[in-house]
Amino acid sequence: MSKLIYLDNAATTQVYPEVLQEMLPYFSEVYSNPSAIYSFASESKKAVDKARTSVAELINAKTDEIYFTGGGSESDNWALKATADAYASKGKHIITSTIEHHAILHTCAYLEKKGFEITYVNVDENGKVKLDELEAAIRPDTILISIMTANNEIGTIQPIKEIGRIAHEHGVLFHTDAVQAFGHIPIDVEEMNIDMLSASGHKINGPKGIGVMYIRKGVKILSFIHGGAQERKRRAGTLNVPGIVGIGKAAEIAKNIMAERSAKEISLRDHMIDRILTEIPYVRLNGDRHDRLPNNVNVCFRYIEGESMLILLDQAGVCASSGSACTSGSLDPSHVLLAIGLPHEIAHGSLRLTLSEKNTVEEIDFVVDELKKIIERLRSMSPLYEDFVKKQNK
């Protein structure tokens, strides 16, 4: 198979042709600034309003609760830093989990330097937040709980509705980083008790450089970027109209095809998992087997170094990763895999394969066949594996 097989959709996705076509006029034809008052600007404003409605409908929010940002990381920073600023008089305690994206963890580290106290609740072996530990961590000065909807590395989906309920029962705001889940699994901000939500365009076949922040009416969040009066005076800066149009169209498509796309991806995902676990020895599936994103496969191979595996897969025309693209190049094992209890030597042998509905069974079979050869080749060069096999055969 000579064509490229892309299995890194958790890192970014291909822009749908329909999304691109929707965006194109707003680069050179309808190029007006939507904040202007002349009639030419009304076309851009209508496009922004339409996109805001599409995003709101995807998560059952009101249109005036949707704010456009420069990406998921900005939205995460906004949620944590602005909440800290606005509610510091009530308290300086924030709760999050040990497996959050670094956009959350590094922001928490920043806030710690500013005098805030962060509690990092643990997860179980499948990556699910321990609800009893979460509730026990709440204090009178707790102002925010931030837990991701689904993990970007191992795909585990959190019990968001229950977490939101716990937060609200204690009078605490609840933010969720939904960057990996938005458009892929059903999200209802009302039913799930969500006060703030972060999302990104390029994870749902939309453009890069555009994100979403949902803020429930009544939540006192301050401006994060200061300047003009855009986004109801909460996020200054000329609106990225093509990007906004793109994420709006991508959200509209995601809402319409979610069930069909999920079914296709789950079928491919489970086929891949079954073959890997059956045909390759000494392998571990990471993440919850059932409560996981439809397109996520994350496994660890014993006596394998992840980077070597990725290089050989790349030579075979397969794009994959060993964890988050935001931490690629790091020699440290994944903080997510360490948090679910894996030792360093096993965490180093991780592989993340994230599919799309465009992939085929033939592609999945090709990748597994190549993977079998690669694992056998790498283990044949490992003295540790040789010693392990000898001990097993005694």
Task: Explain the meaning of each model-derived region.
Residues M1-K394:
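Pyridoxal 5′-phosphate
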